[in-house]
């Protein structure tokens, strides 16, 4: 240890070193700097932003190949971005959305595709209602304390879907719902974790919707600007190309070593990287057993984000907005949104290759993926113009060694109740941020800001700069992006499930049969 201390950078002692220059780490550093804390950010990549990444070139002007969407109730990221001088614009859903299933295209309006089969409708309605009701039982800040936590954590979402749904159509869409929201498969994720994830995003409608939902808006100029503008404010307190390999808190001060053997000394550390990536760091003393087990059990989701550019927005000729929900195992893309610039320039469709499909299609050449996507769009939109793109951008997040995947880490069965409670617990003088540790919109930019600012306040409290009563803060609603209450009709609240309908039919049939028997018996007695 003595030799490490002697070679520390310029002998400078920082109050706090933040590991990770994504939105979570930088929002933590920003808040610390505002309290005149001597803070340094170490980022492994040659850029800031983490799982947000705005690419700029002559073909696209700018494009978000990572996290991009914000919406109502995401008040922290909206407040932070406004402070940084950023503006949002609404994702276009003025025209009709389309659902593609069994080789046919069905235009619709609203958050979810309509269901015309009455039995399937009951099944769909019961699915969303049941998931939301189960979510109400789960504390956002302590899902492992839910009344049925142990039972639900032993189940996969596939188990739960099979238990709730009677029809193939409902099971198929429920599986797609999991793919789209957490970029993983229903058989991979804990039912408890997924129900918690949906709940802390505001429920099934809020998380899936564009209008009044998680995908309502994007940032003019790209989401990467959030991190870039914080970096501009912090100046030389952000260092790029510094992967951290060693953290030693065995002495009075913490010593941090990077891959290129630079040493930094500080009083506190904030880790703002995905939980699984902390396994790349050597800790002294070693991590507690529960945290060590946790970080080995949280895989990242799998996604390839694809943007197809066209000469014109040809889909609008058919009164389509560009949003497609695609239920087809052979289709590369599962969901799309219009990615045209807010001024109408550079028409584009953004599509997600998700979960099992991301793994399968990653093995193909980029040009083959591009061709398959164009052929799919031509089929779904019924237009040969889809075969004539002018440019294509994509980002395979599975190959990013300093992310490991996107959007977020997921909990397999059994992990949340056994190890989940340590995800936000400090280890000595090391505090843990990152969107995975958030309790509201975890997995989104909003969760990243919440987690970063929480850990900053925890460190400020340890430094004696913030009182313990101020550790938890209530974020006021954004005045620029107000949330509308999500309501449900009388029928949505009260229609029976398929099981309930069958029981009702069985009961009424039994009552009718008994009445007939009793009536005939009375006639016999009279005769």
From Swiss-Prot:
Reactions catalysed: a secondary aliphatic amine + O2 + H2O = a primary amine + an aldehyde + H2O2; a primary methyl amine + O2 + H2O = an aldehyde + H2O2 + NH4(+); (R)-adrenaline + O2 + H2O = (R)-3,4-dihydroxymandelaldehyde + methylamine + H2O2; dopamine + O2 + H2O = 3,4-dihydroxyphenylacetaldehyde + H2O2 + NH4(+)
Record site: Important for catalytic activity: 374
Site (Important for substrate specificity) residue list: 335
Protein origin, superkingdom: Eukaryota
Catalytic class of the enzyme: oxidoreductase
GO annotation, biological process: catecholamine metabolic process
Intervals, Mitochondrial intermembrane compartment: 519-527
Residues in compartment: Cytoplasmic: 1-497
Topological category with respect to the lipid bilayer: Single-pass type IV membrane protein
Modified residues (S-8alpha-FAD cysteine): 406
Predominant localisation class: mitochondrion
Similarity comment: family membership: Belongs to the flavin monoamine oxidase family.
Subunit structure: Monomer, homo- or heterodimer (containing two subunits of similar size). Each subunit contains a covalently bound flavin. Enzymatically active as monomer.
Protein name, as recorded: Amine oxidase [flavin-containing] A
Record organism: Canis lupus familiaris
Organism taxonomic ancestry: Eukaryota, Metazoa, Chordata, Craniata, Vertebrata
């Amino acid at each position: 240890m003595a030799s490490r201390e002697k070679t520390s950078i310029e002998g400078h002692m920082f109050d706090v070193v933040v590991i990770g220059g994504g939105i979570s780490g930088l929002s933590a550093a920003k808040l610390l700097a505002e309290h005149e804390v001597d803070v340094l950010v170490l980022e492994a990549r040659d850029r800031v932003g983490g799982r947000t990444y705005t690419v700029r070139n002559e073909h696209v002007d700018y494009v978000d190949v990572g996290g991009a969407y914000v919406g109502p109730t995401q008040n922290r990221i909206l407040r932070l971005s406004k402070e940084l001088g950023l503006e949002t614009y609404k994702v276009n859903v003025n025209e009709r959305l389309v659902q593609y299933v069994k080789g046919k295209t069905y235009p619709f309006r609203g958050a979810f595709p309509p269901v015309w089969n009455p039995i399937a409708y009951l099944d769909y309605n019961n699915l969303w209602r049941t998931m939301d009701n189960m979510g109400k039982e789960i504390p956002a800040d302590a899902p492992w304390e839910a009344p049925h936590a142990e039972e639900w954590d032993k189940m996969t979402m596939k188990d739960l879907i099979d238990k709730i749904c009677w029809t193939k159509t409902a099971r198929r869409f429920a599986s797609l719902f999991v793919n789209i929201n957490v970029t993983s498969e229903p058989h991979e994720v804990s039912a408890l974790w997924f129900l918690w994830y949906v709940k802390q995003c505001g429920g099934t409608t809020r998380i899936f919707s564009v209008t009044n939902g998680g995908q309502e808006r994007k940032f003019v100029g790209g989401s990467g600007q959030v991190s870039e503008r914080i970096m501009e404010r912090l100046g030389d307190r952000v260092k790029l190309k510094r992967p951290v390999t060693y953290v030693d808190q065995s002495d009075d001060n913490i010593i941090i070593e990077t891959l290129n053997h630079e040493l930094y000394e500080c009083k506190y550390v904030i880790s703002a990287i995905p939980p699984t990536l902390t396994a790349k760091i050597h800790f002294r003393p070693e991590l507690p057993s529960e945290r060590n087990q946790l970080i080995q059990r949280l895989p990242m989701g799998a996604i390839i984000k694809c943007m197809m550019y066209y000469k014109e927005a040809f889909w609008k000729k058919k009164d389509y907005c560009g949003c497609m929900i695609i239920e087809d195992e052979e289709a590369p893309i599962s969901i799309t949104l219009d990615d045209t610039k807010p001024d109408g320039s550079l028409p584009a469709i953004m599509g997600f290759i998700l979960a099992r499909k991301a793994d399968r299609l990653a093995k193909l050449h980029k040009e083959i993926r591009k061709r398959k996507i164009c052929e799919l769009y031509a089929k779904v939109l019924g237009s040969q113009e889809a075969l004539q793109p002018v440019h294509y951008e994509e980002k395979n997040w599975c190959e990013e060694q300093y992310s490991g995947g996107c959007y977020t880490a997921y909990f397999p069965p059994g992990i949340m109740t056994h190890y989940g409670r340590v995800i936000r617990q400090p280890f000595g003088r090391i505090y843990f941020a990152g969107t995975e540790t958030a309790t509201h919109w975890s997995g989104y930019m909003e969760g990243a800001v919440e987690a970063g600012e929480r850990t900053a306040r925890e460190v400020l409290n340890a430094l004696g700069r913030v009182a313990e009563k101020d550790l938890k803060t209530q974020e006021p609603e954004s005045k620029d992006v107000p949330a509308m209450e999500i309501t449900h009709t009388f029928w949505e609240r009260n229609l029976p499930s398929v099981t309930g309908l069958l029981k009702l039919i069985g009961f009424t049939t039994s009552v009718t049969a008994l009445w007939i028997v009793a009536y005939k018996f009375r006639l016999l007695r009279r005769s």
